Amino acid sequence: MHKYLTFILLLFCYACAENQSATTTNSNAYAQNFSIEKTAEGTVLAVKNPWPNSTLQYRYLLLSPNTQAPKDSSSYTQIIRKPLSRIVVTATPQVTALELLGQVEAIVGFPQPQFVSNANFRNSLEQNKIAAIGNNQQLDVERILQLKPDVFFGFGVSDNHNALEQLKKAGIPVLWIADWTERHPLGRAEWIRFFAPFFQKENLADSLFKTIASEYNSLQKQLDTLKTRPTVMAGAIYQDVWYLPGGGSYLGQLFKDAKADYLWKDTEITGSISSSAEQVLLKAQNADFWFAPAHYTSYPQLKNDGNLYQRFEAFAHQKIYTYNKSLGPSGGTLFFETGPYQPHLLLKDIVYWIHPGVIDAYTPYYFKPLDDE
């Protein structure tokens, strides 16, 4: 009897080991909104929080060309064959991720492509290899269907989108990209690992992200010895409301990691905060630095929009910085296009301006002071 029980126990342990080896989860270091699992059926990519306050989760099964699809696919949102060769993307950071992986040539469609700055993308556009597909609010479904993409990488604020339903019914897989809802700058950049399996570029993506994270964390550690934390404010007025990043937001995290005392750091808001100009003045009139003043790029612009802006110390001492330093050929702001996948440079820029002397021989790429005229 003892031998029989031992044999059963060994079989059970073996079965558990087999089951564990059949599924391997590639853990993320920072990203919260996607996961990758290697299973017996294939690579499973899960996406959650594709837009703020979403409770939905999507599961995509990625298969090799000759792999048979599972008989029961009810647990998957879509089944996709790799590697992809024809894709439609819908946001400029997605182009940057594909550029890093060397896969821009796979793009065949984009909404309002004239505003993309990436050189390889624009070269393909000039050769008519990339088609305009309307805009994100009104997609040209007929044109997308003509392109016959392997996958449509979506970006939006809800899944209530008639055009995307039409694509699904036509057999085109629609995948939601949630890099933009990540709170940590490195979390956004880590989404390069999500794109990689579609092109069998996992090793490259891991190497690229490791380098980005290493540079970011090394600079952050370098700042640990600083004894002062300059105060920082952000944002500007739009239609009588002052919009500024919440303490739990992407920019809020960058300010924190740059060892700045962001004056709204205690808020848990992950998006933007809506405030009155008077409240902002009361809280931040004496702030040392002012970042991301919306569309403003010069002091005369701020001055012409009323006297209130001039009452801030950052205005008086000319310590206001715009993210419009680097622009693309058509005027697109690279802060939005490439910044999400270059967080180490965003951090470096902020540190350069608020902690003079900490970084030597560096030219900021994204942030610059407002122009004098």
Features from the language model and the residues they span:
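Stable alpha-helical elements in mature extracytoplasmic
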Residues: 83, 93-97, 103, 140, ...
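Flexible, glycine-rich surface segments
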Residues: 219-306
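Bacterial Sec-dependent N-terminal signal peptides
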Residues: 1-23
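A short, structured surface patch at a secondary-structure boundary
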Residues: 52-56, 60-145, 151-156
